[in-house]
Amino acid sequence: MIIKHFFGTVLVLLASTTIFSLDLKLIIFQQRQVNQESLKLLNKLQTLSIQQCLPHRKNFLLPQKSLSPQQYQKGHTLAILHEMLQQIFSLFRANISLDGWEENHTEKFLIQLHQQLEYLEALMGLEAEKLSGTLGSDNLRLQVKMYFRRIHDYLENQDYSTCAWAIVQVEISRCLFFVFSLTEKLSKQGRPLNDMKQELTTEFRSPR
């Protein structure tokens, strides 16, 4: 009876892990596709050659190293991605009617960002079923917020000029490439299904 119950538990665990793995891959694939579309739409928003605005360029100190996913759990990476996309969405939504921007392109860009946020929230929901919590994610989110605070301050100091926005759009493109990189690494995080099978088999064979 105990052995039967154990194998029943193993089958349930493997089935749920398989479903989770498939859902995760599907959502990450969708998020990756949407991110690529967002980059294309962002390029269409540029109304001024960046060469004209080089004197206004600024290093906003994108915290790529401190936000590297290798040192964090999957839940932390999801928190970073979610905060970055949320901040980008808020930045452009507040300036949707900016002179020189085609409103149609801006709206499409916001729709794509919103889709990414929905996919990430779905991922976070799946991950919540696997993890008890994501301690330390508040500090990571704070780093992202401080980075975007520097962008907001720059725009304000430059009176939201066309050149300032051109510089910021290039910076947001960097952000989206970073998001793309994080998404790629996210798909490689976590234990493979074969590792789970091996662990369960070892557990069954180990003497009590």
Curated annotation (Swiss-Prot):
PROSITE patterns the record matches: INTERFERON_A_B_D
Subcellular location: Secreted
Family matches, as InterPro entries: 4_helix_cytokine-like_core, Interferon_alpha/beta/delta
Stated induction or repression of this protein's expression: By estrogens.
MF annotations from Gene Ontology: cytokine activity; type I interferon receptor binding
Record flagged with keyword Glycoprotein: yes
Signal peptide: 1-21
Primary residence: secreted
KW Ion transport (keyword) present: no
Disulfide-bonded cysteines: C53-C163
Cited SMART domains: IFabd
GO CC annotations, alphabetized: extracellular space
Gene Ontology BP, a term: T cell activation involved in immune response
Protein name per UniProt: Interferon epsilon
Organism, scientific name: Homo sapiens
Gene: IFNE
